[in-house]
Amino acid sequence: MATVIDRHSQPTWRDFLELTKPKVVVLMLITSLIGMLLATKAPLDGFVPWQVLIFGNLGIGLCAGAAAAVNHVVDRRIDSIMARTHKRPLAEGRVSPSMALGFALLLALAGMAVLLAFTNPLTAWLTLASLLGYAALYTGFLKRATPQNIVIGGLAGAAPPLLGWVAITGHLSAEPLLLVLIIFAWTPPHFWALCIHRKDEYAKADIPMLPVTHGERYTKLHILLYTLVLFAVSLMPFVIHMSGLVYLLCALALGARFLDWAWALYCDSRPHAAIKTFKYSIVYLFLLFMALLVDHYLPLKLLL
């Protein structure tokens, strides 16, 4: 099916907003904000400077929106085929590819300028690397080249808490890299569960997702294995004394539930297990990071 790009309709501000994938950007900014808060020295000095809070997240959000707009351009043919995405602005021809690319460039330049002016160069360059990793490496190449696209390209999507942390400290350390590792390990079981649910759509669009190339049974096994890896990685903040007992208990409970869903999916023991595993994975990551944050601001010396 050819992409519908020959319709002549005036794009609206809503079309350009949709190009940025605002829901995804909001989720990224939540993890960026959590990274900023975790980088502070709570509870005595646990506040983020307002300039970094506002302009740091603004710059990161603008660059994330730029990467999303490039994704719309590159994936416009695929989007026109899949039921979930066929009404996107480029798939329906409401915005031209050249207009979307110009919009993406404008967002990227504005985001980089804001980050350089109000945070630090390391944050700006790491954000640019994340943008290029998602827009060029993942969207432009990996997505169509290998069923391991999500694993390799997941680093770009895992970057926001690192960016938020570095915006505060100005340097890299083990703690934000561990936050990246948690999201990196979470991404495959999260996305592969959705891919199983939408396997036929990905096959129709000729995207080599793991369930399409290797089958559902193989994919379910890898979801289970990655969930085990995630469970172990999620305990590392406690091991390195980044967090305390409150986080540990939450990580154990949340991880056990994730493993329960991954096992149910592998054994085919529950109806609609794939989409339910996908939905729980979102709840899992949100609550895990909330637990990190709550633990960070609690006077844990009274609890241990």
UniProtKB/Swiss-Prot annotation:
Keyword Cell membrane applies: yes
Record Gene3D superfamilies: UbiA prenyltransferase
Pfam families assigned to the protein according to its UniProt record, in alphabetical order: UbiA (PF01040)
TM helices/strands, residue ranges: 24-44, 47-67, 99-119, 122-142, 150-170, 176-196, 228-248, 280-300
The keyword Transmembrane helix belongs to this UniProt entry's keyword annotation: yes
EC number(s) from the headed UniProt entry: 2.5.1.141
Family to which this protein belongs: Belongs to the UbiA prenyltransferase family. Protoheme IX farnesyltransferase subfamily.
HAMAP family associated with the record: CyoE_CtaB (MF_00154)
Function of the protein: Converts heme B (protoheme IX) to heme O by substitution of the vinyl group on carbon 2 of heme B porphyrin ring with a hydroxyethyl farnesyl side group.
Name of the protein in its database record: Protoheme IX farnesyltransferase 1
Organism lineage: Bacteria, Pseudomonadati, Pseudomonadota, Gammaproteobacteria, Pseudomonadales
